[in-house]
Every structure is written in C-alpha cells, then in structure tokens.
Amino acid sequence: MENQRIFLFLALSILGLLLWTSWERDTRAPVATEEVVEAEDDVPAPAETPDEAPDPADGETPARDRAEVEDERRVRVVTDLMDLEISTRGGDIRRVDLLQHGTTATDDTPFRLMADDRDPLFIAQTGLIDDSDNRPDHRALFRAERDEYRLSEGEDEIQVRLTWADENRGIEVARVYTVQRDSYVIDVRHQVRNAGDEEWRGYSYFQLRRNPDPPGTTPWYIYTFTGGSIYSPDDRFEKISFDDMDDTSLSRDIRDGWAAMIQHYFLGAWIPPESQALRYYTRAQAGNEYVLGMSSGRQTVQPGGEAEFVNRLFVGPKEQDRLRELHDSMTLSVDYGFLTVLAKPLFWLLDNIQDIVGNWGVAIILVTLLIKLAFYKLSATSYRSMAKMRRVQPRMQQLKERHGDDKQALNQAMMELYKKEKINPLGGCLPILVQIPVFIALYWVLLESVELRHAPFMLWIQDLSSRDPYFVLPLLMGATMFLQQRLNPAPLDPIQQRIMMALPIVFTGFFMLFPAGLVLYWLVNNGLSIAQQWYIMRNLEAIEAGKAAKSGKADKDQKKKD
C-alpha cells in the first residue's frame, strides 16, 4: 500500500516538475543592468566614453533621408545554406532563409529566420558613428555593385561590397560581407579611409532588432525562451527577456563575450574577435521592438590613414558542433534548464549513437536500453520488493479486515509484517525517483536540440520533436502502464484503487501532447520494465515453489520416521 502511494505521488510529480521547470525557466532573476534615461534612441554610445556620444536620431528614418527611400535596393546572396537579403539602406540584413531547414516536417519551404515584412520582425544592423550628421550608420544609403550573388560550383566564399562616401569631408567607407561555403557565419568588416584634411573619430556598433513572437505562436504545452542573451567570462550565460528590456536598459563593458537573440532551435548572434572589449547594450523601442547589441571604442583616423572594424554574425540553427567552433560557450544557448548537467551527456550519447545507426528513433531506443542496463540491479531490488508485497497481499487484506478503521493499529501490524517478511515498503520507489530527472532531462533534449527537429523515425512518425499525429505511441504507452499496474500489488484502499486505475488514462492524455521521441522513450522503458519485472517475479515464484516442495518433502520424511 505504501508503495502504491509513493508511485502515485511520484507519477503526479512528473507533471508538477515539468510545469515548475517551465515556470523556473521563465522567472529567473533578471540580468543586472544599469538604470538609464528612457529614450527612443537606437544608436549606441561608444564603449569607452559614453558621455561624448553625439545625440542620436530616433528610430525612424530622418526627414532628410525620406526622399531617398526610393533608392533603396535589396542585394540577394545565395549560398549552399542560406538565401539572404542585404538592404542598401544601412546595410541591414533584412531576410535570411535557411535552405537546409524546412518550415515544417511536411513543408520543405526554407525556414525564414530573419524578416522585416512580417511579425515577428527580426533583422541585423551595423554602422559607424562620428560627430557628423552625415554618417554611415544603419540609416545611411550605401551603394552596391550588384543586385545578386550566388555561390557557384568551385567557389568557397562570396564577398558583397557596399560603399558610402562623404565627399565634403573626404571620408570613404566600404562595408564588406563575407559568407563561406557550409557556414552560417557572415563576417562583417567596416573599412574607413580618410582622404580629407581633418582627422576622423568614430566607433562601430553591431546590433539585433526584433519584437516578441505573436501570441499563440507556440502551443501552451511547449515552453521555449524567446529573447536576448549575452555571455561574458565573469557572469557566464544570461538571458534577457523583453520584459527585462522594458524595465531597464543594459549597459555593460564585456571582453571576450557575445550577444544573441535566441528562439526555439535558432538564433542570431554577434560574436566579436577574441579579447576585444565592447559595450553591450539593450534598448526598448517604440512599436514593441527591442534592440540588443554592442559598440566598440572610438578610433581616430588621421588624414590619409585607414581603419577597420570587424565582427561576425551567426544566423542559423543551434547545431552544437557549429556553435562550439564559433566559441566554446555558444552551446550554452541550447538551454536544457536546471538539468543541463544530465541533459548534455544524454544528448552526447544520443548524437554518437545516431551517427552509427543513422536514425534518431533507434538511438532513443538504444539509449533507453543503456539506461535500463545501468540501473538493472537497482530495478531488480525494487521488483523483488514488489513481488514480496504481492505475495503477502492476502495477509495484508486480513489485517485490514481485523483492525477495521483503527489505522494506527493497522499500520503497526503491517510494519511488523514487513519486518517479519524482510520487505522494504519503500523499496519500489527508488527506480521511479531515478527516472524522474532522466525523464525531464530527455524532455528538454528533445525539445531544445535542433538536431532532432523534423527527425523521422519510421512509418507515421516523421518528426520526433513533435507529438504523434495519430496518438498511437501514447495509447501504447498507456496500455503498458495499465499492464505494469497488473503486475504490482493492488492498494487496499478502494479510493486508491480507483485513482490508480485512472492514472494510465490521465497519463495517456498528457503524453498525447509530448514529443513523439519522449513518448517512445517512456514506451520502451515501460516495456523493458515489464519484461524485467515478469522475469524476476517468475524466478521468485520458482524459488518459493522449490522451497515449498522441499518443506513438504521434509515433512513427509519426518512423518515416515515418526
């Protein structure tokens, strides 16, 4: 009876822990920020001397530039992995389609990560700031040599060159975008040449602008974080929600860090050169838009001199091998919650097995088998305890009938029975306790790992990261739960009996919302548990039968002697 109560409590705890995990991930302490005066500015101050920054214009296109809007052009760049558009207005990256990732499991249309013509808006911006009103920021009009670039066979990279000039001051700026084959990285380089008579002093900035996802974008039963994030060696990985940006604006000097806008499976991130100190900032803009970026220190370019400002933009899936190549800490953007220490080894194991078998579903089955083998002895102890509980079930029923409503006397008599039969009433709960963190860790692995996005298994399961479209796996899982209950000792309390009978139905309904890969894990785990429990119970019954036969034979022999 105690075993059943514990099982019921732990089973329901799975639901509570999943809900708590979602709440905990969404209500972490906000990033420490500096209070700043609210403004509509979308151009940052320089890293080292923010008080010297010129007054920036607001986020709208200045009146002096509105007549030039018609001159804006879009430069299309197509590689083996990306199809993107760069606007000559500021050189913004305003559209990015990921050619190797479909919109859904059944729609091969490339997934659009960045766009400026829909909700949510998501674009990348960069520019240079100096003391002049005419400056090459993200509102300036650049010139492009061509309207389209395509990576041809035999080519390893594409370079897109945009130019801007202030003839009155003799300042010439070239912005060069470089995209490599088999890469989601866009290298951005500002080249400043001073052909004038006076020195030029300015700084660069690199930022991401987006707004929150519209309500209803993701189902209520799937929680993923969408918002900003920064990394620094001192404070490690920090998430910055849009609400945090509304409350306060970040302004922090960071060396050897990065800043990103992250969402489910994908991210856009500025990753500056190593050891470069930059000022990281956030802004809440009008129109429900938010800016996260970084600005460099001022540089001085003497007449006849040149200077460069460089950065890297990653726009793509959170594939951990690629992220690790960019920066050791970039894999932290794949957020597995408070069980990261368990989830990362699980993903590593899944990933390596998948490399061998070539199927993520088969990898999940094999990982489940390995986990079961790792805890085989622990589970065996539990199932032996359950088998003993089942064997003394008739005697427990007699105790209940004898003591009636005297629960204290009943509990005392049951404890004496447990002691006499050497039964640990809590022995069956330990494997369940062990499975709960594994279950939750695997849940986040399946939910957060883009490697499993749209990963097929077999037959009707074409996406292990989404729910079973025909609910076959949840129904089978519910059937295995019901079968497991038949192997366990039944509760003495009629109310508990009804609750335990309803539990497989409740869990079947809940698992209909879970990713198919997670249901597959639970189904296989239940099947292996049933097989192990049946094997142990059969052996114990054989042992008991052998003991009874020996005892009977001994009694007969004794009678013959008498």
From Swiss-Prot:
<dbReference type="InterPro" id="IPR028055">
    <property type="entry name" value="YidC/Oxa/ALB_C"/>
</dbReference>
<dbReference type="Pfam" id="PF14849">
    <property type="entry name" value="YidC_periplas"/>
</dbReference>
<dbReference type="InterPro" id="IPR001708">
    <property type="entry name" value="YidC/ALB3/OXA1/COX18"/>
</dbReference>
<feature type="region of interest" description="Disordered">
    <location>
        <begin position="33"/>
        <end position="71"/>
    </location>
</feature>
<feature type="compositionally biased region" description="Acidic residues">
    <location>
        <begin position="35"/>
        <end position="58"/>
    </location>
</feature>
<keyword id="KW-1003">Cell membrane</keyword>
<comment type="subunit">
    <text>Interacts with the Sec translocase complex via SecD. Specifically interacts with transmembrane segments of nascent integral membrane proteins during membrane integration.</text>
</comment>
<feature type="transmembrane region" description="Helical">
    <location>
        <begin position="356"/>
        <end position="376"/>
    </location>
</feature>
<comment type="similarity">
    <text>Belongs to the OXA1/ALB3/YidC family. Type 1 subfamily.</text>
</comment>
<dbReference type="InterPro" id="IPR047196">
    <property type="entry name" value="YidC_ALB_C"/>
</dbReference>
<dbReference type="InterPro" id="IPR028053">
    <property type="entry name" value="Membr_insert_YidC_N"/>
</dbReference>
<feature type="transmembrane region" description="Helical">
    <location>
        <begin position="4"/>
        <end position="24"/>
    </location>
</feature>
<protein>
    <recommendedName>
        <fullName>Membrane protein insertase YidC</fullName>
    </recommendedName>
</protein>
<keyword id="KW-0813">Transport</keyword>
<dbReference type="GO" id="GO:0051205">
    <property type="term" value="P:protein insertion into membrane"/>
</dbReference>
<feature type="transmembrane region" description="Helical">
    <location>
        <begin position="426"/>
        <end position="446"/>
    </location>
</feature>
<dbReference type="InterPro" id="IPR019998">
    <property type="entry name" value="Membr_insert_YidC"/>
</dbReference>
<dbReference type="Pfam" id="PF02096">
    <property type="entry name" value="60KD_IMP"/>
</dbReference>
<dbReference type="InterPro" id="IPR038221">
    <property type="entry name" value="YidC_periplasmic_sf"/>
</dbReference>
<dbReference type="GO" id="GO:0032977">
    <property type="term" value="F:membrane insertase activity"/>
</dbReference>
<feature type="transmembrane region" description="Helical">
    <location>
        <begin position="330"/>
        <end position="350"/>
    </location>
</feature>
<keyword id="KW-0472">Membrane</keyword>
<keyword id="KW-0653">Protein transport</keyword>
<dbReference type="GO" id="GO:0005886">
    <property type="term" value="C:plasma membrane"/>
</dbReference>
<keyword id="KW-1133">Transmembrane helix</keyword>
<comment type="function">
    <text>Required for the insertion and/or proper folding and/or complex formation of integral membrane proteins into the membrane. Involved in integration of membrane proteins that insert both dependently and independently of the Sec translocase complex, as well as at least some lipoproteins. Aids folding of multispanning membrane proteins.</text>
</comment>
<keyword id="KW-0997">Cell inner membrane</keyword>
<keyword id="KW-0143">Chaperone</keyword>
<feature type="compositionally biased region" description="Basic and acidic residues">
    <location>
        <begin position="61"/>
        <end position="71"/>
    </location>
</feature>
<keyword id="KW-0812">Transmembrane</keyword>
<dbReference type="GO" id="GO:0015031">
    <property type="term" value="P:protein transport"/>
</dbReference>
<feature type="transmembrane region" description="Helical">
    <location>
        <begin position="499"/>
        <end position="519"/>
    </location>
</feature>
